[in-house]
Amino acid sequence: MRRPRRRLIAALVVTAALVVVPALAYAATTISISGATASFPLIELLTNRYHNLKSGKVVFKVSQGGASVGISDAAAGKVSIGDSSRPPAATDPTGLVFYPIAKYFVCVVTNPANPVANLTAAQVAQIFTGKVRNWSQVSGATATGPIDVYSRTSVAGVLTTFQNTLLGGSKVSSVATQEASEGLMQNAVKKDPSAIGFLSDYFALAKGISTVGYNGTGCSVANVVAGTYLGVSDFYEVTKGPASGPVEAFIYWVQSSAAAKKIIQSNWIPLGKIEPAVQG
């Protein structure tokens, strides 16, 4: 990163502001962010911490909508940063840079009234593609009757992660009820004893949700760190071209500071090392 040059430019701008328009010297910088609902709890914690660290001189406007929405907003220049819970895709606009900031994982989940200890990869595929539609066909299930399958909408990066890592590249059946956010999916599964869905770790490990093992491996931080659980992906900060100025400073802080790492470790998984940006 162009750290020395950036600091020099910043120093010159501040000096000019002090000389020409003193009142503007303390104007706050606004960084706008939109995108993934899965990463929103993490981004909220990180931006609040950074805002306080900068004594209020950096202000964040954060909105949700889904990973693809954040990516599109960043490409269109509508926001400073797009939050993504999936890696770059061939269909994404050109010129984007994806900066990985943390790892997360996806769990198959059910209602606590129907705790299912484990499903094989074949069972997960059969249920979510609509080939198995009744709980009586699922060993270990206590529920009987039709399976209520829940999914995320097409803009969700968590859907991409689930399909690519736990569904073998297959698509979730169109009969599934689609939820627009992780919070809505979580609430739907909590309320429906016949439900099965998938959630990112922050929402899956919350009270009122039962996680399902995959091929004999529990969906847990320990198994992800050990490399035995498959449903893992990264959260990304996405910018139109290489990040610069205050946006670059924020992303660098997220990727490198001890304070950010501590926040990430609270509910997510830090990157093993600072990885280079992925050019989309």
Task: Walk through the language-model features, giving the residues of each.
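Exported/periplasmic ABC-transporter solute-binding proteins
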Residues: 26-280
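Bacterial N-terminal signal peptides
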Residues: 11-21
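Bacterial N-terminal signal peptides that target proteins for export
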Residues: 2-12
